[in-house]
């Protein structure tokens, strides 16, 4: 039904109307919350360790969460590290997880972390960045050093534009184009670069170094700290929805997806379960 009238008057009257709390009651979202809890229990977060022994980025963020805790403020850039930070860091306070959502703003984390530190100087602030994002705004490390913002940066370096690489792996048969950011030696040397910009910086390459490095960074509070975590290039973000498909087609892992509604009931019959097992066995052969 259209509302025709002077915008100022109409909006004022609508505001007055809805300000009367007895006019509108918020709908209960408990059924939806219960549904989400059920899905989280049935499809818990997880990741695979890399066969080649390289560091898993999910482990880095999981350890950061356990070490720095939920009282720290976490800010992310854009890409795989953004998704992993959302999944593997435990948040229980409002305004402690800052990112730009789906806006695609590579380079967001360092300036935003500086803003968070300026607003709440008593808080520990971690910028979680990828090697691609970091090269968009790493010069602001100098600003942080000069202006006295001792932020901490967890630099997840997989030597690639990881989210683009994942799409090329899954949907373009592994034909990689313009995603590799280095060769045998990663370029630039992020430790030397960060030190030149006024930060303390060090590199982590194995799982047994992660917690100690994070704790070391937490103890430095007179300047920015950049911790470079060199991780495997083939780690992927799950769950995922392919372009042009419905949210109902979400995949929990490659080739695996949960069922919803009537599909869910049908998929849980013994016949359907046996069919799934047989299909997986044939695929494995």
Where are these regions (language model features)?
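Active-site diphosphate/adenylate-binding microenvironment
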Residues: 35-116
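Alpha-helix initiation/capping motif
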Residues: 19, 25, 56, 69, ...
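Short coil/turn segments at secondary-structure boundaries
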Residues: 26-31, 77-78, 228
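A diffuse structural propensity rather than consistent per-protein peaks
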Residues: 25-28, 56, 189, 206
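Structural signal for hydrophobic packing residues in well-ordered secondary-structure cores
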Residues: 11-22, 36, 40-47, 65-68, ...
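Thiamine diphosphate
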Residues: 2-4, 8-12, 73, 84-285
């Amino acid at each position: 039904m259209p509302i025709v009238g002077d915008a100022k008057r109409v909006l004022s009257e609508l505001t007055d109307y809805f300000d009367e709390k007895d006019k509108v009651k918020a709908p209960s979202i408990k059924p939806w919350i219960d549904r989400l809890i059920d899905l989280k229990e049935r499809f818990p977060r997880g990741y695979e360790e890399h066969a080649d022994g390289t560091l898993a980025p999910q482990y880095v963020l999981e350890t950061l969460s356990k070490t720095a805790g939920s009282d720290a403020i976490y800010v992310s850039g854009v890409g795989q590290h953004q998704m992993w930070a959302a999944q593997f860091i435990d948040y229980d306070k409002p305004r402690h997880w800052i990112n730009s959502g789906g806006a695609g703003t590579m380079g967001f984390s360092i300036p935003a972390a500086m803003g968070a530190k300026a607003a709440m100087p008593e808080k520990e602030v971690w910028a979680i960045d990828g090697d691609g994002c970091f090269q968009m705004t790493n010069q602001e490390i100098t600003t942080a050093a000069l202006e006295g913002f001792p932020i901490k940066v967890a630099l997840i370096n997989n030597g690639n534009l990881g989210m683009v690489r994942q799409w090329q792996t899954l949907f373009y048969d592994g034909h990689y184009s313009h995603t590799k950011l280095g060769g045998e030696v990663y370029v630039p040397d992020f430790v030397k670069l960060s030190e030149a910009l006024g930060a303390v910086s060090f590199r982590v390459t194995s799982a047994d170094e992660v917690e100690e490095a994070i704790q070391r960074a937490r103890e430095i509070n007179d300047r920015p700290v950049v911790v470079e975590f060199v991780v495997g290039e083939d780690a992927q973000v799950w769950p995922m929805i392919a372009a042009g498909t419905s949210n109902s087609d979400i995949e929990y892992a490659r080739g695996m997806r949960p069922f919803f509604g009537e599909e869910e009931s049908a998929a849980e019959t013994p016949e359907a379960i046996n069919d799934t097992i047989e299909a997986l066995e044939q695929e494995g052969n």
